[in-house]
């Protein structure tokens, strides 16, 4: 609990790298876990970025675990994307699992403060990192987090996995939603996630369409 982790970059190095990337039109994707790491990243971003709205690079912070309310406010002001992995909650955030073992029962409620972030207006982009890969698992734990105060609705979680990711990749004109003119990338589930959000992780994909072509059909004879 007393260990704050290992910083791979000091502030001056990080700020120099961020400035060089930003000035050359390169999108930043900064890995930061822990309040101290996030504080350093946010402070550097505040020094580097112009006023919000002047850039289309859509810089983002990866993971964002253990954000404080003040840090969330500052990220919102910078219009930086929060790239997060709600599947971590299902893997490590349940009672007795790694988060509680390392940080104690009082701290674990806000390790992944999805509700606070969504309410602040920050764009959420969800992904899997290295485990487990299935997005339905991540959607499930964003909606059914152990602490009600940090739960999202099914619509919010699905949007973060679809339009949120597309926006983070500057690809929302091509993918992320089912609209005329966009690529036909979609799935059909065996149940409606809006009717019973408590069973999302157990729902099965019946049909997968990629770029307009059926690539998986569970019941095809």
Residue ranges and their predicted role:
Residues 65-67, 88:
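Acidic, glycine-rich active-site loops and adjacent beta-strand->loop/helix elements
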Residues 1-22, 72:
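Active-site-adjacent helix-turn-beta-strand microarchitecture at beta-sheet edges
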Residues 18-29, 36-59, 84-198, 203-211:
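His/Asp/Glu-enriched, well-ordered alpha-helical/loop segment
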Residues 59-65:
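Extended hydrophobic secondary-structure segments that form protein cores and membrane-embedded regions
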